[in-house]
């Protein structure tokens, strides 16, 4: 073992040990969630499994965490996959959806503004934490972005988890309970039947890597905020719109991304006293109520104005996860491209504008800290337990 230490730095061995333990717990929990039909099972399962496991088994806590050097390549890949959802066939139909698209964008801006003002002025949140908690959509991407911008990324995770739970409870009820569960099951089947990396041509794998790395380098050169996310998103979008690339979602990477993001946040949550989380839970529920009420009103208005089915418009508007909501649309016979396009535009709108907006807003104790020198993604977690918001 001593010889191994002379070859591999101690910090790297520690990071690898944490990764192995975290991924073992995350994978087991995710597989369990998959078996009982939970939506986004590997994301939800890894988050809850690592969180609860670390909270109940205190000696496990020092061995949980996902290092930043592992986390950033995952974000690169996520950026490429977000950009890949924009292709020419979707763009060809965008013109006839202009009214619903504008309504959705305006609703998103209004909802985010209301949520931000509530959390900032009445609950005392720091500006960046408030804006990250207020954005309606893109759970995995929001959590990944929060880790780069604030210390208390577990608060952002809690807000988005509450919203997703509300959506997955309310939407199947609106679309009939049995069919809703069928859609969740199909969503999980779709994850399992995505193409494997072993089935991809070598050129697709090379393209995937190049879009991520080159996109990040271009964004760094242009001094764009969060270059490892925004760069791959921008370059991937351009290449897919121009027809230069056509990348599928790869089963192994999608699962890996869910495990890495969910496991990282779960490890942070495990070290935060439960009493502190309760202080944020009330705010998360209030924020979710505002989001869903606003989108519900927008859905009613647009359905009456255009004659579009209420349920089709609701699926296009409700921020409950692009892939899961798209599969709900497929099960119930709605226009899948219509639903997917609106969700994709909202996610793109949020994550192309949010880094610049968050930097402009600035922040206090949850503002940016120079973590670039951190070799372990778990070292900053000691400062994550700030005081809960006001009252």
Question: Language-model segments: what does each one mean?
Answer:
Residues 72-84, 107-108, 131-143, 164-170, ...:
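Small-residue-rich segments of transmembrane alpha-helices in multi-pass membrane proteins
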Residues 68-69, 73-111, 120-122, 193, ...:
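Helix-loop-helix hairpins and the membrane-proximal interhelical loops
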Residues 2-70, 80-90, 111, 197-273, ...:
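Structural signature of multi-pass alpha-helical membrane transport proteins
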Residues 136-142, 156-179, 294, 322-324, ...:
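Membrane-embedded alpha-helical segments of transport systems
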Residues 164-209, 216:
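Long hydrophobic alpha-helical segments that form multi-pass transmembrane helix bundles
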Residues 122-162, 310-343:
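Alpha-helical membrane segments and immediately flanking helix-loop junctions
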Residues 45, 65-78, 98-100, 124-135, ...:
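Cytoplasmic-side transmembrane-helix entry/capping segments in multi-pass membrane proteins
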Residues 116-125, 167-188, 222, 300-305, ...:
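Juxtamembrane and boundary regions of transmembrane helices in multi-pass small-molecule transporters
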